[in-house]
Design a protein with these regions (language model features):
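Positively charged n-region of N-terminal signal peptides that target proteins for export
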Residues: 1-8
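OB-fold single-stranded nucleic acid-binding module
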Residues: 21-24, 30-240
Length: 240
């Protein structure tokens, strides 16, 4: 009888353990993002950041947006799970540029460079890198504005909340060109930009920014570009 009881108890314990293990695994899987596996010879984001200027770099990342294609080149804003990349004038056919929709994974080879504080990949070439997709959510960088930690998120898709519009000006005083947007937070001014090659005059964001007035309070989304300091390339604006 004791032997039968022991066997029953053992079976019950095994079933309990299996149930617990299955439940834990399902919970972990639901919480964790899909693995962003790099191909052989491809740098992690940390390795890219640590690479010397002017050295060759090879990265894999996901297209978040790109500027207008021209002269067989396209400038791409890309991001992986760990950081973001500004890929300047990537060699690309017009047909391939049309395939660079948000989320598309690409492998890029080029040289790490810097211009006015903006770290970028120069002279890049690329190839498509499989079917995996990823579109980043906007990182709320409001609390980092004006701090040394902000640059750690350079080129990421970010949002700044509760900014006050100080001024709106068109490049060369020509509506239809870039829009220079001066915003403030806690008494400090920052220069943002609507890049016409990223969001052209026919886009909703270009029209919305054109109509803003000094004193308006807004939330701003965009890519954390750098030009002698933060110079976010605006992709969305919400007036409060």
């Amino acid at each position: 009888m004791r032997k039968i009881t022991a066997i029953v108890l053992a079976l019950a314990l095994m079933l309990t353990l299996v149930g617990c293990t299955t439940g834990g695994s399902a919970s972990t899987t639901a919480a964790a993002p899909a693995a962003d596996v790099k191909s052989e010879g491809v740098m992690t984001y940390d390795e890219y950041i640590a690479a010397e200027m002017d050295s060759q770099v090879v990265i894999e990342a996901y297209v978040q947006a790109h500027q207008s294609w021209w002269d067989n080149k396209v400038t791409v804003y890309a991001q992986d799970y760990d950081g973001a990349y500004f890929i300047y004038e990537m060699a690309c056919s017009e047909a391939d540029a049309a395939k660079l929709v948000p989320g598309t994974k690409i492998k890029v080879t080029g040289y790490k460079g810097e211009w006015a504080g903006e770290v970028e990949i120069m002279d890049p070439t690329f190839e498509f890198a499989g079917d995996a997709t990823y579109v980043a959510s906007a990182f709320d960088a409001t609390a980092l504005l004006g701090t040394d930690d902000l640059i750690k998120h350079q080129n990421e898709f970010v949002v700044f909340k509760g900014l006050t519009i100080e001024s709106i000006a068109f490049k060369n005083d020509a509506p239809g060109d870039d829009i220079y947007v001066t915003v403030s937070l806690n008494g400090t001014n920052y220069d943002f930009c609507v890049e016409r090659y990223l969001t052209d005059p026919d886009t909703d964001v270009y029209k919305a920014v054109s109509e803003l007035q000094a004193g308006d309070v807004v939330d701003v989304e965009g890519f954390l570009y750098w030009y002698e300091g933060v110079n976010t390339h605006i992709t969305g604006v919400t007036k409060k």
